[in-house]
């Protein structure tokens, strides 16, 4: 192989690596380590709330993505039962709620300061540009920077 051909090959190697990474990001499967989004209600939450503390242990809106993080898990570590939707969670119990339809859901939640929690389930990104953009946003974080 001639010297110019070697240099062309070496110069094209980084471009090929970048192109391969972009292709994988756009078309590669979504395989998270766990599809669960876990929240814990810590011990003493109810007592603090009854004492007048504004306890913010759960977000107002939980965002899930079908096929990626589409299972909500609540763990009650408190000393008293907690209600989430139609479910009564006794102390030490966990509640697992898988979602299969993209939508916005409202639940009664005694562990939440407002008594309500919203779960927004977004559709999973389809292969191609949409998945590439989704992975880029996930990599960059909420503020758009790493």
Residue locations for each model-derived region?
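Extracytoplasmic copper-binding redox domains, predominantly the cupredoxin/blue-copper superfamily
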Residues: 2-146
């Amino acid at each position: 192989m001639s010297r110019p051909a070697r240099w062309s090959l070496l110069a094209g190697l980084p471009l090929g690596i970048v192109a391969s990474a972009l292709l994988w990001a756009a078309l590669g499967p979504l395989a998270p380590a766990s599809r669960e989004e876990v929240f814990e209600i810590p011990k003493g939450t109810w007592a603090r709330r009854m004492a007048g503390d504004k306890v913010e242990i759960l977000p107002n809106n939980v965002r899930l993505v079908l096929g990626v993080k589409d299972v909500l898990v609540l763990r009650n570590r408190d000393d008293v039962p907690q209600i989430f939707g139609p479910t009564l969670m006794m102390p030490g119990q966990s509640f697992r709620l898988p979602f299969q339809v993209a939508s916005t859901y409202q639940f009664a939640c005694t562990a939440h300061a407002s008594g309500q929690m919203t779960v927004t389930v977004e559709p999973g990104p389809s292969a191609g540009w949409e998945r590439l953009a989704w992975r880029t946003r996930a990599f960059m974080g909420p503020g758009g920077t790493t």
